Amino acid sequence: VSTMNAKTSSGGEEEASGMRNETLGEAKRRQVIYVAYMIAALDLTFLFMQMGIMPYLAKSLGLDSVGFGYLQTIFGVLQLVGGYIFGRFADQFGARAALILSCASGSIFFLLMSLSTSIPLLFLSRLPAVFMHGMPGAQKVITDMTAPSQRAAALGRLGLCFGVGIIAGSAMGGVLSTKFGIYVPTYVGLVGSLINTLIAMVWIPSQTKPKSDHHMTEHSTSRSGSLFSITEILRLMKFPGVMEVFIVKVFAGLPIGLFMIMFSIISMDFFGLEAVESGYLMSYFGVLQMVVQGLVVGKLASHCTEMTLLRLSVFVFAGVGLGMALMRTVWHYCIIAVPLVFAFSMLATITDSILTKAVPSSDTGAMLGICASVQPLTRTVGPTIGGVLYKQFGVSSFGYLQLVVNLGLFVYLLKSKIPLGDVKS
């Protein structure tokens, strides 16, 4: 009987694999995934490039620190609102259409930014950010085109793109704005985003899902046609394990997210760093991100269960919190950064993998959109909460908050029996 079951299981896997290969072919599928990585790397490079010059551009136009805070909050709110809508769009119209929308929105974003010669125009340039979701778009392509067993490792490699974006974007923004003028990086971002749009149009196929999943998608979209629906979000959260894992995803990284939002001020006031030294520190983070995602996350994902890795990332986060509470110099922070980047990368990769496997394939885009909204949510509420923590209790408060929250989550994960399974129908 066990032999028959094994054969049946093997036959089912071969049939599923055959459907996937029938859609595009193995070599073509790998090529499309590599193109998705390239689009994500370029998109993040341009994003970090504009983030580097934005404070200087805002200051040159006469915007004070309070106004700049409003500008950042608007960007966060737009990304927060657009994340889920973008995911639903990807489910209904395909990953290719979603990536084209993201890259085209990026082009409009940089065009408006290049024309921002006044404060109102600078605020107006934030509007296209509602559809600028290159990373979730690439995640959608990879989710559609990888088997569940390979998904965590494939999504983890996107962290390499993040590292490339931090290093290349920060460096390009600084060099171009210093040598050629503050608006030159926006011209580069405009041209680069247009090229990214063409790459998505030419190299990403119109249908990235296996044929069986494509029929499910058509059924799903006919059932719920609107791009934004609270009912649909609640429906996704009711799948086994989804709400529990999503809560861990939000709260485990929230304290460190607050710290990173305040980091520009902390680096000046607490560490006493100059702008150039802060840039070096960001590059160090980028290198760590690439090493961890390229050499560690994928290998651990292939040898350990996802629940084990989720618990590990939360436990390491708790240790990072203790280190942050005790740190006094930038060298302490450089040491803490190693487990910090590991926990951050592992948590993001594993939770995305678990959540996309826990919902039907016709809803993976919406689920990725919800996941992508976590960071903008932190950016929206972060300046207020982070500012109060820093002003009233100092840098150590971020560490103690990180320690307490993640110890609580670790105990919760040890005691709870979260059902983790592939729910594809």
What label would you give each PLM region?
Residues V81-T117:
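Conserved MFS/SLC helix-loop-helix module at the cytosolic interface between two early adjacent transmembrane helices
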Residues S125-G163:
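Cytoplasmic helix-loop-helix junction between adjacent transmembrane helices
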Residues A97-L111, T308-G323:
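Structural signature of the two symmetry-related core transmembrane helices
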Residues A41, F109, P120-H133, H332-M346:
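Hydrophobic core of transmembrane alpha-helices in multi-pass small-molecule transporters
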Residues G83-G94, S177, V292-T305, Y390:
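Helix-to-loop junctions at the C-terminal end of transmembrane segments
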Residues E13-R30, S206-I247:
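Juxtamembrane intracellular "pre-TM" segments in multi-pass secondary transporters
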Residues G52-V66, I261-E277:
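Short amphipathic helix-loop junctions that connect adjacent transmembrane helices
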Residues G76-Y84, I166-I167, G286-G294, R379-T380:
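Residue-level signature of mid-helix packing/kink "hotspots" within the transmembrane helices
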